[in-house]
Amino acid sequence: MARALHAGAISVADSLSGSRLDGGVTDQRPPFKFSALTRVWFSDTDAQGVVYYGRYLPYFDHARTEYHRHLGSLQIEGAEFVMRASNVEYHAPARFDDPLECFVRVSRIGRTSAAYDYATYRLPDQALMVTATQTVVLIDVATRRPRPIPDEVRALIRAFEGDDLAE
């Protein structure tokens, strides 16, 4: 039996069959305003039958990518974000075929860096699986040196995150 993700929203089964995998705006878990769905693949699990700790990083990457796709800031010409730091806390084990919803937000934006917060929940019981904070730095692809985040990208993030964004 499928259960709704959000009031009036599509079911978990419908969501994971394609229409919501790219992510979407949500008011389910403030201060998060965006989430992306995924499912635990067999290759994500370890010998204990649970998600191997390092496999959560691709879930965060998926959510972060879809967040920027939604904002229209997926690519910045001549620049790319690189990972500076990642801090992950594990709260409960996810298992093969569990549907997961990964919430993402930009919590801070600096001159050349941004901090992302994540919270991933198992569906449909809404059990918290993992939380994380990651810091990325924008670099020039030619020099591999940090460069300022463009004002247009900052404005898109600021408009979406509102007062929850630290600068």
Where are these regions (language model features)?
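Terminal targeting signals and extreme-terminal segments of soluble enzymes
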Residues: 3-101, 107-115, 119-167
